Amino acid sequence: ANVYGNFYGTPKKDVIQWLDDGIDVILEIDVQGALQVKKSYPEGVFIFILPPSIEELKNRIKARGSETEETMARRLGTVLQEISLIDQYDYRVINEDLEVAINRVRAIITAEQCKLNDSEVDRIVRRYKEEL
């Protein structure tokens, strides 16, 4: 995906292999990338993590020292567009305090792991019927 003039991506075959191996895959991607992944994996769980304010976003980008003024301006110019797509995500986490945000993401992962898919439910129901 082209993000602020740079190209990023995660090899699809790696992701498929990890999923096949039962590994939870976490992708740190922008909105454009997340929507592309969601088309291929609608059953995925999507978490929108955002800072508490634009001012805080600016401070964090500056503190990294990895963005030029031009790149930062371009990035900030897309913030409203990206936030307008927040309803495409399953969860939202405001990263005001890093530890709190990490714990919320962990809680989301744990909750999602507790969900049974239809085939698991069918298997359990069949076992119940066999045991009765």
Task: Describe these PLM feature segments.
Residues 25-30, 39-63, 95:
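Conserved phosphate-donor/acceptor-positioning beta-strand/loop module used by diverse small-molecule
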Residues 1-5, 61-70:
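Flexible beta-alpha connector loops of hexameric P-loop NTPases
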Residues 66, 81-132:
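NTP-dependent small-molecule kinase module
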Residues 17-20, 38-42, 84-86:
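Conserved catalytic network of the ASCE P-loop NTPase/AAA+ motor domain
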Residues 1-25, 31-35:
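ATP-dependent small-molecule kinase phosphotransfer cores
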Residues 14, 60, 104-107:
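Alpha-helical scaffold elements adjacent to nucleotide-binding pockets in ATP/GTP-utilizing enzyme cores
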Residues 33, 53, 100-101:
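Short phosphate-engaging motifs
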Residues 42-44, 56, 64-84, 96-100:
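Ras-like small GTPase catalytic G-domain
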